[in-house]
């Protein structure tokens, strides 16, 4: 006599296996056909093979490529670029630095990033001085304030900034604010509602209603941009939160941020207005947001953005070119060091060619997993002659790079797959000896608070530490 229960169970099991393995094989096929970085492809395949259920869920939420998605139509994009392009064409012929003309052209061709001369640059390395300057400039606003931050906290600093924005909105100043929905998950809605009630236009970037059930959580706006009246701008690594001023019980919070004055602010304005279109579907192109600006200084600068929705990885490509260009030195301090193969090979090549390449990382990081992954790359860098330092005075959150007393960049971009592949980022690239010398001195001052890592000693770290680093490195493209 047939056991129908057994047969039904067998059919259900076979059907489940077919669907289960079909989903895994289908997902692996999609990953392979996507023609992405082989390292990232293998990382996803390993996750799917050894952690199939978790791997399927993670790939659905975090792994799908968005590079074919278009945020804004070409016609609208050209309309938005019309004013800064006119300003660029109207300026006297820029004398491009001989050593970085190709880098400037790269950013123009891939990012529509116009180089503007006649700018003034002010550098901040502590949160207090940056916030004080920001509050002063906000108080001077008479026409508009445009602001976007990854984190806009409901704390003493956030409330000070909020109150100024509300006051300005009541005075008739146009105020627009973008905050990242994931970066501000824990901030109560009432904090933003108070601004809206005062007339501030507030939008969240890629709102995530159910964080664990949407791939939007993977694509975050990590930019920190402020534009005031189209004349003054801020960009860098600092968010609006008290900890950027206060630091921790065990040390200071060390970061780098810029105040910019001059035509280069048009680049920040364009970046913000593109993001505003993304969150509000309102295209703002009026010339009053791009006022005629007098010469404020001597710096030549570009504002370069990167996002997960275009064909190019603009800032990563620029970083590779910036590393291989110097003849004397290249200093860099990122929060994380999970480099793509192109970036790592560029650093090794420069060091082997005799360039003084220095890498500075935080001794204590905010993410242990990412810190382990960062450490897994250091042996290869050290072997090629890269000098590695761990900053011990506090928490190093800075994203600064300087080379040959000619080029420097500050922004939101880390040296990791997330910044290069998934985040919306922005950096100011400055071609100016005075600024580069200042950045170099900042780096060297930080170096005095560091412990240097030597290859021979680094190889002696415990085997279990090496094993942990190696395991995390397998997942580096996914972090």
Residue ranges, per PLM feature:
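Histidine/acidic-residue-rich catalytic or RNA/ligand-binding cores of hydrolases
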Residues: 341-344, 371-373, 403
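Catalytic-core elements of nucleic-acid end-processing and repair enzymes
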Residues: 399
């Amino acid at each position: 006599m047939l056991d129908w229960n057994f047969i039904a169970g067998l059919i259900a099991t076979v059907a489940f296996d077919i669907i289960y393995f079909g989903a895994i094989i289908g997902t692996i096929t999609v990953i392979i056909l996507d023609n992405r970085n082989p390292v990232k492809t293998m990382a996803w395949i390993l996750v799917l093979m050894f952690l199939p259920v978790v791997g399927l869920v993670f790939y659905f939420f975090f792994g799908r490529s968005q590079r074919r998605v278009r945020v804004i139509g070409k016609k609208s994009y050209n309309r938005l670029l019309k004013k800064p392009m006119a300003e660029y064409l109207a300026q006297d012929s820029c004398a491009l630095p001989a050593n970085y003309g190709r880098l400037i052209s790269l950013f123009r061709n891939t990012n529509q990033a116009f180089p503007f001369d006649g700018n003034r640059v002010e550098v901040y390395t502590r949160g207090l001085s940056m916030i004080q300057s920001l509050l002063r400039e906000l108080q001077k606003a008479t026409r508009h304030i445009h602001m976007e931050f990854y984190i806009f906290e409901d704390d003493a600093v956030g409330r000070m900034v909020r109150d100024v924005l509300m006051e300005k909105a009541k005075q008739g100043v146009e105020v627009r604010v973008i905050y990242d929905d994931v970066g501000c998950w824990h901030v109560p809605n009432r904090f933003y509602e108070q601004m809206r009630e005062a007339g501030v236009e507030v939008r969240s970037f890629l709102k995530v209603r159910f964080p664990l059930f949407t791939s939007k959580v993977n694509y975050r706006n990590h930019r920190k941009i402020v534009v005031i009246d189209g004349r003054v701008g801020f960009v860098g690594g600092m968010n609006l939160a008290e900890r950027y001023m206060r630091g921790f019980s065990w040390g200071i919070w060390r970061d780098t941020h810029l105040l910019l004055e001059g035509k280069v602010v048009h680049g920040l304005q364009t970046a913000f207005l593109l993001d505003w279109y993304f969150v509000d579907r309102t295209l703002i192109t009026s010339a009053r947001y791009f006022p005629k600006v007098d010469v404020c200084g001597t710096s030549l600068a570009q504002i370069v953005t990167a996002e997960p929705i275009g064909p190019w990885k603009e800032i990563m490509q620029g970083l590779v070119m910036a590393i291989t260009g110097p003849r004397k030195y290249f200093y860099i301090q990122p929060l994380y060091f999970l480099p793509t193969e192109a970036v790592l090979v560029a650093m090794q090549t420069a060091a082997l060619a005799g360039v003084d390449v220095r890498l500075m990382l935080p001794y204590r990081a905010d993410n242990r997993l990412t810190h382990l992954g960062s450490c897994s790359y250091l042996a290869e860098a050290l072997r090629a002659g890269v000098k590695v330092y761990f900053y011990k005075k506090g928490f190093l959150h800075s994203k600064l790079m300087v080379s040959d007393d000619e080029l420097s960049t500050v922004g939101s971009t880390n040296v990791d797959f997330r910044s290069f592949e998934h985040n919306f980022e922005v950096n100011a690239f400055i071609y100016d000896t005075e600024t580069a010398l200042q950045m170099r001195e900042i780096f060297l001052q930080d170096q005095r608070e560091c412990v240097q890592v030597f290859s021979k000693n680094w190889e002696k770290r415990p085997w279990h530490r090496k094993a942990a680093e190696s395991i995390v490195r397998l997942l580096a493209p996914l972090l």
